[in-house]
């Protein structure tokens, strides 16, 4: 900063190897240096020579290529291709863990759990539930029929969309029940809307703004997965504080490792989820996700997705928490390491703590 080289400042990487042997350096100094590097990387400066939007777009394409290759590998495995024995064992352990955590998928529970969240929806103005219930719902073509059934199950929702004039009530229906909507009352879209939000000076974060009915159903599945994770010992509602405390203790006693992955949700591929999850759960997750990115600056405005879901999808956080938990548990089982969920193992999205 002294010489005005802001590019080098925001691109600087903290490397613990620079402090080895660690006992020659003050822990306070290491902490201060790490905090300084982290803070400066996130300052929202406009710096000549850096294009955070282009960096984010390149990152999306990079992770899509990773997912494409992963999908090809799982397709080859399904067709009888070679899979390393150790990897095969871990993957099947993960299947069993995920199946036990999830149990049965109950459609009635899914319908009850569906809701709108606080974020934006594609093709809908406003972010409140009132805005979303009163707007013409957006939905992907794959989910249109199920989304229509969700709306038509709620007379008040139909009335909010169509109004309550005398012509909106059907003589064939119970008194006061509005005419059901048809597909023509929905906004059919091809996928989610590509959007960027500030993250660091060097790159933005990509967000996929979901169609209204898709995210309404996605949040229901997310709530169901969250409830089942809690029954299995992982309470995502209390995890942030628990993870911070375990990370602090690990830094003092050196008995826990902390793992924070780059682009974690963007590297969960379609075929991975299909391989790991029970069929009914996979079908439910798959039908309400988006398969394309609209308004993507490259690839002709419409990007077919190799990833299964991303930030913006209503169940991505719970989905990745379950997958990463299964990786930790399966790997520990294979290595003969004993895990204690409340003392040495925690997962919160892509923030992982393990022995």
Each model region followed by its residue ranges:
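Core nucleotidyl-transferase/polymerase catalytic module
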Residues: 1-17, 159-355
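Non-catalytic, polymerase-adjacent accessory regions of viral genome-replication enzymes
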Residues: 1-195
């Amino acid at each position: 900063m002294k010489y005005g080289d802001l590019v080098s400042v925001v691109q600087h990487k903290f490397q613990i190897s620079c402090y080895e042997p660690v006992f020659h350096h003050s822990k306070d100094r290491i902490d201060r240096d790490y905090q300084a590097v982290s803070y400066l990387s996130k300052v929202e400066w406009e710096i000549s020579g850096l294009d955070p939007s282009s960096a984010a777009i390149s990152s999306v394409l990079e992770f899509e290529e990773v997912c494409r290759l992963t999908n090809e590998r799982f397709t080859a495995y399904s067709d009888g291709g070679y899979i390393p024995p150790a990897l095969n064992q871990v993957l099947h352990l993960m299947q069993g863990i995920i199946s036990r955590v999830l149990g049965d998928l109950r459609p009635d529970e899914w319908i009850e759990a569906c809701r709108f969240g606080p974020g934006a929806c594609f093709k809908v103005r406003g972010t409140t539930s009132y805005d979303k219930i009163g707007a013409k719902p957006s939905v992907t073509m794959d989910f249109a029929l199920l989304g229509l059934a969700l709306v038509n199950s709620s007379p008040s929702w139909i009335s909010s969309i169509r109004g309550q004039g005398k012509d909106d009530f059907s003589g064939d229906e119970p008194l006061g029940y509005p005419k059901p909507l048809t597909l023509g009352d929905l906004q059919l879209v091809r996928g989610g809307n590509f959007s960027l939000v500030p993250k660091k000076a060097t790159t933005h974060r990509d967000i996929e703004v979901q169609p209204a009915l898709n995210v309404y159903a996605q949040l229901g599945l997310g709530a169901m997965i969250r409830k089942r994770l809690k029954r299995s010992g992982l309470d995502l509602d209390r995890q942030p504080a628990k993870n911070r405390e375990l990370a602090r203790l690990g830094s003092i006693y050196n008995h826990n490792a902390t793992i924070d992955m780059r682009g974690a949700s963007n590297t969960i591929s379609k075929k991975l989820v299909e391989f790991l999850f029970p069929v009914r759960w996979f079908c439910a997750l798959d039908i309400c996700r988006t398969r394309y990115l609209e308004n993507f600056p490259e690839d002709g405005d419409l990007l077919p997705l190799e990833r299964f879901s991303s930030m913006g999808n209503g169940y991505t956080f719970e989905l990745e928490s379950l997958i990463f938990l299964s990786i930790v548990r399966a790997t520990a089982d294979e290595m003969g390491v004993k895990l204690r969920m409340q003392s040495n193992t925690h997962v919160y999205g892509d923030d992982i703590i393990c022995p």
